[in-house]
Amino acid sequence: MHNIFKGLITALITPFKDNKLDLYALERIIKHQIKHEVDAVLIAGSTGESSSLSFEEYKLLLQTSVEIVNKCIPIISGCSSNNTTYARALAAESTKIGVDGFMASPPSYVKPTQHGIYKHFEALHEVCNLPIMLYSAPTRSGVDFSDETILRLSKLPRILALKDCGVDLERPLRIRATVKKDFNILTGNDEVVLAFNAQGGVGWTSVASNIVPNICKELLEKWNKNDTKGALEIHQKLLPLYTALFVESNPIPIKYAAHYLGLCENEIRPPLTEASDSAKKQIENIITSLSIKI
């Protein structure tokens, strides 16, 4: 099975207007990503406010995204839930709609054992024929995969990758030493992309690339061509942006940044709130200093 989980994957925001999906803005957002040749887009992840979506909205979001992308790049759907039955329904619907793969985290809040995490993903694996990326986000889910559970899950034929949002930079080395050769490891933290890939990562699921996909793509291309100096120069330039985009809970800052650049409304669903005035000012200053334009 072809492994689509590599390179630059943008964790897309979900645009809303008047508390409904803004499908016109969605088209602008996706076409901006296609224009700058990202390797894939992730729809309905945590950056996409997936927990705020009804099942019908989730379906509409995926269906519209598939139509807009029209097979130009792979689409990865988010299928995380603390209810295994509901997560299976998301995975089954993703398969039916025609996405190219999906990502899921361990069930949040309920704090399953490692065996429970394994059984959750085994159930998702059984319900579809799509490639799967594990999503390690312990600060969000409250629980994480052990290295042993990752190894065990990697033996299932369609579990092909791990997105790691942790800060243990030794982890990709440990995982790489035990898993099958075609199992990919990607970082979900913009600020550690180079350090992570130096330790065995093969890509990056990025929040910042919602607004600077061209610069993020250039960074990875330089890294992959062994132009370490060039990659570091770009990374250093982007560090203030990475900081600004996490000055408040993701996706609050990136939603405002996208709005400021004309991609969508600055509408975010409760319990999240729009960016504070100080956060807005910080984001505006960084966008101006980097001369970011859409």
UniProtKB/Swiss-Prot annotation:
In this protein, the active site sits at 135 (proton donor/acceptor), 163 (schiff-base intermediate with substrate)
Going by the entry's taxonomy, the superkingdom of the source organism is recorded as Bacteria
Q: What positions are marked as the site Part of a proton relay during catalysis?
A: 46, 109
* UniProt keywords, alphabetically: Amino-acid biosynthesis, Cytoplasm, Diaminopimelate biosynthesis, Lyase, Lysine biosynthesis, Schiff base
Family to which the UniProt record says this protein belongs = Belongs to the DapA family.
Cellular localization per UniProt: Cytoplasm
* First-tier enzyme category under EC: lyase
Pfam families noted in UniProt: DHDPS
Major location, coarse class? cytoplasm
Query: Which cellular components does GO assign to this protein?
Result: cytoplasm
- What is the name listed in the Swiss-Prot or TrEMBL entry for this protein? 4-hydroxy-tetrahydrodipicolinate synthase
Q: Does the keyword Cytoplasm apply?
A: yes
Free-text function comment from the UniProt entry: Catalyzes the condensation of (S)-aspartate-beta-semialdehyde [(S)-ASA] and pyruvate to 4-hydroxy-tetrahydrodipicolinate (HTPA).
Pathway where it operates: Amino-acid biosynthesis; L-lysine biosynthesis via DAP pathway; (S)-tetrahydrodipicolinate from L-aspartate: step 3/4
Complex and partners: Homotetramer; dimer of dimers.
State the species of origin: Rickettsia montanensis
Q: List the catalysed reactions.
A: L-aspartate 4-semialdehyde + pyruvate = (2S,4S)-4-hydroxy-2,3,4,5-tetrahydrodipicolinate + H2O + H(+)
Q: Which CDD domains match?
A: DHDPS
Give EC number(s), comma-separated: 4.3.3.7
